[in-house]
């Protein structure tokens, strides 16, 4: 018989098993298995944008719990890993890391540097994901900037062009002057900022003074109208008249519109092109002229003697206010706090510019998308409202153009041929992937076309993350249609709650437009990982936890244990106490396994190979039967929780059973029988050892999705050379049940609890002998009474039924 190792070294063992799993391809996807037997995951491709943190471990391990469970349940698993390595986040990382600016160098040179940086950063991710034992199939890896991904992303674009769901137009868009690019509505965040409400004097064309209030006086040269509410009696006499703007002396119409708030400012509002969404509405509704004074770099260009040209927005605002004061045109200023729309990544206040852009039709599909949100299985269910709220709030079509460099190019040129100037030329599907700066449309020379210099929003590509893995977009656009049909729609999208409005929404939109379907059946939402004081982790606070240090201190299984203790969808604080509990659990699993191991040589070979159902009749002891029934109940409960994506509940049930039912009670109660040193009860001994054998094996399997290394190590020592994590290794005891009265075993436990408390109060050892136990309220069977005598060290037990409740008198 082999020896049980003296101790468990997590550092050595975790590395050992990670290597073995890769070598033996335990996690390999089998493309020959039927679709119905395959479970497909749309893994979040991490953004290559900076330092790895504990949040990556937190969210990705929670997905892995479900994946490992599904594999053990017999599913053929398609579990890829991708890297979202194109777009603005990566560009910002490269610019910061290399201390360069994209606009100061050749485009090709900057792209080359980006490619070098992402290759290095992605290797760090691979290393971490292997260390935390993500059971991905690395042969399925993809990058969003790879040629294949660019091809599929461009297919998505062309398919939507063909379906008339994409258009290009010169219209107002949100512009980030810091990053120099257009943004979509989902790329912005509202920030509370202090400012001034400036009360400025205008005049009517007849010279009568008018006072308007504005927070953006620098937009005076872009003023195209002044509005009042049609029901506002103060201004009804202005109908049909014009106003003269101060400083710039431009004549603009005075118009009525119900969008004006009578209680804000003076009730007179200047409309500029453009200060906000309302300006756009008025510009379109009233067919107003366009005056563009803000450049793409966020400076003023109005070519006026006020000399604010070339100034940044805030500088121009300060200067205009000074001039207005000097000319006594500024009546007063009020301190205010208002909401400003800012770029989510750069933090810069956004401007509204009119620039030709590509848009995906979104507003016209809002009702359909709300129906899709309802069709999807949400885990947890309360997260659905976040998507519904976002869909209801959408007021712009999705702008997918970005004026950047490291991204997927639009497969588009613009004709310069005589007679078709400006005609949009699309690449043929056979040309993809293409770069319009290097390639040409069929039948055109370089001199006859102008390439589209923009790249796609990174979400335009990551929104087809399922299709990047399935290698197809639709019936007409596919690299491998058979593969796509087999894998799409997928089974699961795991992701964080803060990107429901972006990644989840855009992916649902694309699948709806491409194939009139959902992209997946289930969506599993994770929360945030917070600092121990429940504040958000940030570099500025110095509270960001680095995974490498925690892995070195605790190991992967303990970190995964901490992650498994957080409820699905909930924000969870890092906890040193939970980490210590995880370490304690690993140690207890090891010691419990060591105890059961010493008895296994007493088992017959065929009984070790048989299932619990097959050897059911050989478990003869009443308490052993009760234990197996409790185990069967646990398996059913834990399985149900995992099938419903409630991994934390499954972990809690299993851990509580292990500590309380198995270690604290069963091991202690059956210990004397298991050893049977006096050979009094060979049948009872064999029954207990069989029970130990199968309960420990089952518990290892229930813990396996959460703590893969320690369970694999113990499983190999105790049971098999085959991996515990292979397909179909889960337990199914649906047909197993012993017809016994559970009251007997439960009564034994109640009596034992009373005795333990008595000994603890008397500061006695748990093994301290007892002369007599007088028990009323229950009469135990001879088997249970013998187990009770052994575990309490009682010489004699007397039972009588004179009480309704169990009472115990202890005589030392």
UniProtKB/Swiss-Prot annotation:
Q: Which domain of life is it from?
A: Bacteria
Per its record, the protein catalyses: tRNA(Val) + L-valine + ATP = L-valyl-tRNA(Val) + AMP + diphosphate
Record flagged with keyword NAD? no
Chief place where the protein resides: cytoplasm
A GO CC term assigned to this protein in UniProt: cytosol
Instruction: Tell me yes or no: is ATP-binding among this UniProt entry's keywords.
Output: yes
Quaternary structure (record) = Monomer.
The entry's protein name is: Valine--tRNA ligase
What species is this protein from?
Answer: Rickettsia rickettsii (strain Sheila Smith)
Which gene underlies this protein?
valS
């Amino acid at each position: 018989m082999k020896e049980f190792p003296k101790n468990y070294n997590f550092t050595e063992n975790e590395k050992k098993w990670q290597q073995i799993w890769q070598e033996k391809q335990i996690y390999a996807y089998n493309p020959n298995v039927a679709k119905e037997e395959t479970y497909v995951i749309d893994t979040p491709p991490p953004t290559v944008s900076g330092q790895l943190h504990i949040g990556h471990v937190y969210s990705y391990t929670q997905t892995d719990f479900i994946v490992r469970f599904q594999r053990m349940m017999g599913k053929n698993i398609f579990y890829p890993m991708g890297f979202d390595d194109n777009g603005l986040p990566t560009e910002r990382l490269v610019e910061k890391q290399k201390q360069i600016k994209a606009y100061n160098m050749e485009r090709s040179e900057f792209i080359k540097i980006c490619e070098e940086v992402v290759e290095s950063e992605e290797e760090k991710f691979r290393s971490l994901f292997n260390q935390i034992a993500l059971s991905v199939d690395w042969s399925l890896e993809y990058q969003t900037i790879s040629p294949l991904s660019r091809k599929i992303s461009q297919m998505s674009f062309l398919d939507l062009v063909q379906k008339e769901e994409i258009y290009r137009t010169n219209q107002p868009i949100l512009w980030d002057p810091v990053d120099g690019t257009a943004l979509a509505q989902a790329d912005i965040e509202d920030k509370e900022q202090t400012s001034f409400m400036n009360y400025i004097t205008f005049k009517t064309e007849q010279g009568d003074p008018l006072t308007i209030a504005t927070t953006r006086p620098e937009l005076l040269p872009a003023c195209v109208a002044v509005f009042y509410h049609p029901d506002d009696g103060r201004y009804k006499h202005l109908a049909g008249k014009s106003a003269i703007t101060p400083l710039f002396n431009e004549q603009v119409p005075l118009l009525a519109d119900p969008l004006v708030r009578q209680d804000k400012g003076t009730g007179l509002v200047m409309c500029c092109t453009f200060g906000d969404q309302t300006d756009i509405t008025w510009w379109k509704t009233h067919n107003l002229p366009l005056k563009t004074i803000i450049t793409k770099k966020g400076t003023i260009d109005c070519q006026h003697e006020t000399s604010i040209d070339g100034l940044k927005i805030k500088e121009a605002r300060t200067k205009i206010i000074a001039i207005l004061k000097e000319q006594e045109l500024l009546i007063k200023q009020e301190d205010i706090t208002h909401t400003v729309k800012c770029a989510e990544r750069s933090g810069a206040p956004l401007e509204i510019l009119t620039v030709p852009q590509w848009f995906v039709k979104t507003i016209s599909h809002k009702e359909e998308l709300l129906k899709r949100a309802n069709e999807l299985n949400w885990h947890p269910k309360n997260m659905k409202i976040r998507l519904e709220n976002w869909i209801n709030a959408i007021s712009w079509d999705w702008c997918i153009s970005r004026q950047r460099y490291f991204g997927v190019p639009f497969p588009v040129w613009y004709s310069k041929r005589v007679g078709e100037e400006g005609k949009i030329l699309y690449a043929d599907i056979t040309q993809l992937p293409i770069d319009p700066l290097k390639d040409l449309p069929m039948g055109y020379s370089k001199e006859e076309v102008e390439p589209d210099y923009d790249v796609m929003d990174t979400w335009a590509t990551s929104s087809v993350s399922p299709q990047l893995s399935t290698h197809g977009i639709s019936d007409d656009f596919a690299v491998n249609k058979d593969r796509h049909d087999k894998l799409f729609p997928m089974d699961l999208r795991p992701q964080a709650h803060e990107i429901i409005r972006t990644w989840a929404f855009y992916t649902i939109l694309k699948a709806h437009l491409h194939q009139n379907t959902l992209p997946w059946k289930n969506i599993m939402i994770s929360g945030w990982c917070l600092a121990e004081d429940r504040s958000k982790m940030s570099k500025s606070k110095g509270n960001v936890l680095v995974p490498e240090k925690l892995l070195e201190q605790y190991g992967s299984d303990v970190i995964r244990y901490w992650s498994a203790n957080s409820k699905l969808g909930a924000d969870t604080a890092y906890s040193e106490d939970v980490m210590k509990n995880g370490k304690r659990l690993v140690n207890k699993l090891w010691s419990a396994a060591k105890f059961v191991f010493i008895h296994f040589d007493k088992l017959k070979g065929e009984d070790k190979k048989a299932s619990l159902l097959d050897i059911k009749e050989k478990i003869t002891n009443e308490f052993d039967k009760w234990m197996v029934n409790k185990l069967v109940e646990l398996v059913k409960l834990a399985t149900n929780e995992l099938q419903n994506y409630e991994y934390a509940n499954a972990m809690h049930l299993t851990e509580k059973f292990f500590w309380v039912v198995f270690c604290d009670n069963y091991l202690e109660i059956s210990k004397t029988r298991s050893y049977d040193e006096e050979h009094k009860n060979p049948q009872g001994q064999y029954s207990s050892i069989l029970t130990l054998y199968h309960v420990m094996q089952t518990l290892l399997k229930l813990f396996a999705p959460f703590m893969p290394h320690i369970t694999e190590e113990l499983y190999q020592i105790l049971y098999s050379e085959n991996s515990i994590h292979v397909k179909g290794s889960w337990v199914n005891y649906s047909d197993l049940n012993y017809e016994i009265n559970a009251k007997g075993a439960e009564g034994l436990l109640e009596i034992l609890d009373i005795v333990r408390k008595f000994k603890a109060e008397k500061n006695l050892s748990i093994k301290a002998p007892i002369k007599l136990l007088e028990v009323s309220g229950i009469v135990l069977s001879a088997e249970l009474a013998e187990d009770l005598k052994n575990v309490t060290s009682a010489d004699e037990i007397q039972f009588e039924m004179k009480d309704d409740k169990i009472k115990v008198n202890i005589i030392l």
